[in-house]
Curated annotation (Swiss-Prot):
Function comment: Produces ATP from ADP in the presence of a proton gradient across the membrane.
Biological classification of the source: Bacteria, Pseudomonadati, Elusimicrobiota, Endomicrobiia, Endomicrobiales
InterPro entries: ATP_synth_F1_dsu/esu, ATP_synth_F1_dsu/esu_N, ATPsynth_dsu/esu_N
Family per similarity comment: Belongs to the ATPase epsilon chain family.
One GO cellular component term: proton-transporting ATP synthase complex
Superkingdom classification of source: Bacteria
Pfam families, sorted: ATP-synt_DE_N
Subunit field text: F-type ATPases have 2 components, CF(1) - the catalytic core - and CF(0) - the membrane proton channel. CF(1) has five subunits: alpha(3), beta(3), gamma(1), delta(1), epsilon(1). CF(0) has three main subunits: a, b and c.
Organism: Endomicrobium trichonymphae
Protein localization: Cell inner membrane
Protein's name in the database: ATP synthase epsilon chain
Length: 138
């Protein structure tokens, strides 16, 4: 069977890099299996398990969100969290939970920053309008 290159990255670094005849991914539209010669595709990676058929056996990688890019017989995965299933421990699970909480807080901060920025712009317009009205009265 023909092989193709797969690289899986997480914030911690490269989780897997190598050639394989087959890899299956959890996506937001279900499980997709990629074989050599697959069409070019970019799709969202869902939480779940990536299954890689390797020469030394099946490898399973647990992932939590991200993106998959398939271009010219190369598969690149960027995951928010990724680890070999046999490496999963309480510590890794705690890290994933902490990361999710951190992302949630950052999103709240972003929304709050957006609200603050909008309020500042509105206040600047109000101030400018008020100064123009005051000048006209003088």
């Amino acid at each position: 069977m023909n092989k193709f290159e797969v690289e899986i990255l997480s914030p911690e670094g490269i989780v897997f890099k190598g050639a394989t005849p087959s890899v299956s991914f959890p996506t937001t539209r279900g499980i997709i299996t990629v074989l050599s010669g697959h069409i070019n595709l970019i799709t969202k990676l869902n939480s779940g398990e990536i299954i890689i058929e390797a020469t030394d056996g099946t490898k399973k990688i647990i992932v939590s969100g991200g993106f998959i890019e398939i271009v010219n017989n190369n598969v690149n995965v960027v995951a928010e969290f990724a680890a070999h299933s046999d490496e999963i421990s309480r510590q890794k699970i705690k890290q994933a939970i902490d990361h999710a909480k951190d992302m949630k807080n950052k999103r709240k901060e972003f929304v709050n920053m957006y609200a603050i920025e909008s309020q500042l712009k509105k206040s600047a317009v109000d101030l400018k309008s008020g100064l123009e009205i005051k000048r006209k009265k003088i």
